[in-house]
């Protein structure tokens, strides 16, 4: 019998083992769709970004107008830009849901997979931040100024670090040029780390909603999950295209339609919606270094999650106390997102401080306590 090229060819064999004959648990739910959706988001962003880069000029006097030119004069330039801008939002929606799934079902116990995932999140956040600066509107400029300035809170080397990042004494042409270079480079770095992420995942195989071994009941990825992923893809693309075509500026800031002006500060400087939760945590501490540390901790805390798992059960499927805490955490993050978009005044300040405290309290103290308590409850 002739050998099957899918299983014998050195390259096709790798694809086959990752996407076709991959043994997958028979009971994984739609929450397991988001990995493939993230891959599609990345591919879409790289493609639309490449097309935009062909028409973009990384110069402070031309950047804003090159983006306007793309939207007005390039064939379907408006569409490419809208897909790219809103694609970033959907990328973050998918990654937040993907992380939420990992938290709920204890997927973080695959430590290498989880840690590479956190690195992917950080790289994605860096990519989105430098990308937001490129249109060189008011919010682009002031966002870049405010966020890069946070590094000056680092003792001793802070100011030097900021001026080194800026390439001068303020956000100017060198800053824009290097941000464009970084924004072009980082998505390919993300693609590389994604392969490492998958390599670690395929060492152990996927987790499942019951949190028990699924070795006794595996099914091939294709056609079962390839088809299921295509359904998820269609369900994501419908709202994505609706947003990009009907209200492309819904998630953007009107301030960014004004070209960058270092002499005029916008009344409310705020990042894109997907950074608002971290921005709210940053602002809730009335001290520069303290705020920066809290900001870093808000994301890096994910690296501690595997060590804070005290339950004898892996998933939250049969753990009502942890479930309540999980949904409290979700609600808390929504409150933080809302607070991040509000001005720094009463009552938003105190709400933000309470929500920031709750965020760390739930993750660091209440989750491990609930896990230990549920273990005790199993004995009765």
Curated annotation (Swiss-Prot):
The keyword Transmembrane helix applies. Binds 2 heme b groups non-covalently. Heme b b562 binds at residues 84, 183. GO terms for biological process: mitochondrial electron transport, ubiquinol to cytochrome c. It holds the Pfam family Cytochrome_B. One of its GO terms (molecular function) is metal ion binding. It is found in: Mitochondrion inner membrane. A ubiquinone binds at residue 202. It is a multi-pass membrane protein. Keywords: Electron transport, Heme, Iron, Membrane, Metal-binding, Mitochondrion, Mitochondrion inner membrane, Respiratory chain, Transmembrane, Transmembrane helix, Transport, Ubiquinone. PROSITE patterns: CYTB_CTER, CYTB_NTER. The chain crosses the membrane at residues 34-54, 78-99, 114-134, 179-199, 227-247, 289-309, 321-341, 348-368. Heme b b566 binds at residues 98, 197. Its cofactor is heme b. One of its GO terms (cellular component) is respiratory chain complex III. Component of the ubiquinol-cytochrome c reductase complex (complex III or cytochrome b-c1 complex) that is part of the mitochondrial respiratory chain. The b-c1 complex mediates electron transfer from ubiquinol to cytochrome c. Contributes to the generation of a proton gradient across the mitochondrial membrane that is then used for ATP synthesis. Belongs to the cytochrome b family. Heme 1 (or BL or b562) is low-potential and absorbs at about 562 nm, and heme 2 (or BH or b566) is high-potential and absorbs at about 566 nm. The cytochrome bc1 complex contains 11 subunits: 3 respiratory subunits (MT-CYB, CYC1 and UQCRFS1), 2 core proteins (UQCRC1 and UQCRC2) and 6 low-molecular weight proteins (UQCRH/QCR6, UQCRB/QCR7, UQCRQ/QCR8, UQCR10/QCR9, UQCR11/QCR10 and a cleavage product of UQCRFS1). This cytochrome bc1 complex then forms a dimer. This is Cytochrome b. It comes from Polyplectron bicalcaratum (Grey peacock-pheasant).
